[in-house]
């Protein structure tokens, strides 16, 4: 359960104080489908334009037109890439009926990021073979829900729609997806129950015998592994030159002794492993300036009534709730400075949690962060973000498995404003700290990523060997 998902859930449940006057694109599109109407052409055009500007595989010119009950999104230079978004309301065609649960505002003019996932659901068999039943459009506002969560939600919708088509017509459905901006991720991260969209067939008037579950055709993207199986080094090199930006990761495992030493050092320095790693990453992220912005995302499990043992803290990018800015010039010079920064990070996060200002700070802090990006304060290099989960929460981490925090696609990192991003995850398993440095290649080169990972780990090891200042009370 990602912090962004829980935050979206709480925003949806929140009081009128946190209510937003406008709905996000996903809500608008869902409501349009429920009403049997087309999503607004202007909304789709803005969303597709956001995607196109950030994806080198798509042409930078798009045209959105409405023709009767069909909405067409066309690449002006290639008619074969046209995507038709249509709504059917005839007696024989199933229609989507869903309960949207994301309700927030977005402002693309201020830098808020929209993405689009389009899937075509068609029947196979009988008189309707090859005929498109409907097309599902998911428009994501990145400020409230990350790309992995949205793709997973989209997949959940597809599975349910496939079951509905099978139950209604008795035909085995086949799901074909045209993903405009990102490949599907292999790892399934179930969203919370509140995010499961409830879909029903409006035309169904009587109960039918239960049918076995139908698995839609998997959506796969050709990756480097598929390329390697087809030929030698020359083929791989040629294919690599043509590959779009793709997610890669560097894994670093500390020894059990180093892990214990780090935890002990953090306690002596009155901070946490989360904050120490965040500080080390900020010190070594080359953004071309001493000004770094670190945003804090807090898992809201205790706010939604889940056991306290499942609580974990996070420091992240736009799936965060509060933004804090630090001058890392002094911290980069000495280990004492890095510990000072770690204490500042911890204090800010704890204050954000315990003061009850979390949601208010989210609404105001992200807007300020977007303005900082637009003002160019973070341009000129690589800006590092850190997402930390489950350190010291091994019982919960083991329920998910050690690979849950390392094997997922981080391709959306190339689209974040302010320059390329690192995504750092940290987990403990059997008393050993596992660090994963995710990045997008070639947006960030392999050499630069390796230098960043080595420097961050080196800073942590140097911090371990530094005694705390006199008079500091351990936490």
Language model segments and positions:
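Short hydrophobic alpha-helical segments that form membrane-spanning helices or hydrophobic packing faces
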Residues: 61-64, 150, 154, 275-282
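Generic recognition of stable, solvent-exposed alpha-helical segments in well-folded globular domains
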Residues: 43, 148-152, 257, 261, ...
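Hydrophobic/aromatic-lined pockets within catalytic cores
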Residues: 145, 158-166, 267, 281-289, ...
């Amino acid at each position: 359960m990602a912090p962004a998902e829980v935050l979206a859930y709480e925003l949806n449940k929140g009081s009128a104080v946190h209510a937003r006057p406008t709905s996000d694109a996903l809500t608008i599109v869902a409501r349009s489908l429920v009403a049997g109407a087309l999503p607004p052409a202007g909304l789709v055009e803005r969303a597709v334009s956001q995607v196109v500007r950030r994806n080198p595989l798509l042409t930078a010119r798009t045209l959105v037109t409405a023709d009767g009950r069909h909405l067409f999104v066309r690449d002006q230079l290639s008619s074969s890439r046209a995507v038709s978004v249509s709504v059917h309301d005839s007696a024989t065609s199933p229609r989507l009926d869903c309960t949207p649960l994301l309700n927030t505002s977005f402002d693309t003019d201020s830098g808020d990021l929209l993405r689009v996932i389009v899937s075509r659901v068609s029947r196979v068999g009988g008189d309707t073979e090859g005929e498109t039943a409907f097309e599902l459009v998911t428009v994501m506002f990145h400020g409230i829900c990350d790309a992995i969560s949205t793709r997973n939600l989209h997949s959940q919708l597809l599975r349910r729609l496939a079951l509905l088509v099978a139950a209604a017509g008795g035909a085995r459905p086949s799901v074909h997806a045209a993903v405009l901006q990102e490949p599907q991720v292999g790892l399934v991260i179930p969203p919370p129950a509140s995010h499961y969209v409830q879909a029903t067939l409006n035309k169904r008037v009587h109960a039918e015998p239960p049918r076995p579950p139908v698995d839609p055709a998997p959506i796969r993207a050709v990756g480097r592994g598929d390329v390697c199986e087809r030929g030698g080094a020359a083929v791989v090199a040629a294919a690599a030159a043509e590959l779009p930006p793709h997610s890669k990761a560097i894994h670093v495992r500390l020894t059990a002794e180093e892990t214990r030493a780090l935890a002990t050092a953090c306690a002596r320095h009155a901070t946490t492993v989360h904050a120490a790693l965040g500080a080390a990453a900020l010190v070594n992220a080359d953004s071309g300036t001493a000004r770094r912005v670190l945003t804090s995302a807090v898992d809201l499990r205790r706010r939604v009534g889940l056991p306290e043992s499942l609580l974990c803290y996070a420091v992240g990018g736009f799936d965060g709730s509060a933004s804090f800015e630090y001058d890392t010039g002094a911290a980069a010079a000495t280990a004492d400075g890095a510990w000072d920064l770690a204490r500042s990070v911890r204090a800010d996060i704890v204050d954000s949690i315990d003061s009850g200002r979390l949601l208010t700070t989210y609404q105001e802090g992200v807007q300020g962060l977007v303005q900082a990006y637009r003002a160019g304060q973070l341009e000129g290099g690589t800006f590092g973000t850190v997402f930390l989960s489950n350190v010291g929460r091994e019982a919960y981490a083991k329920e998910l498995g050690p690979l849950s925090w390392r094997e997922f696609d981080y391709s959306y990192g190339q689209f974040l404003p302010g320059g390329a991003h690192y995504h750092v995850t940290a987990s403990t398993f059997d008393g050993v700290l596992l660090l994963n440095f995710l990045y997008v290649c070639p947006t960030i080169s392999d050499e630069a990523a390796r230098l960043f990972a080595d420097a961050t780990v080196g800073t942590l090891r140097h911090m371990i060997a530094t005694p705390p200042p006199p008079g500091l009370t351990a936490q």
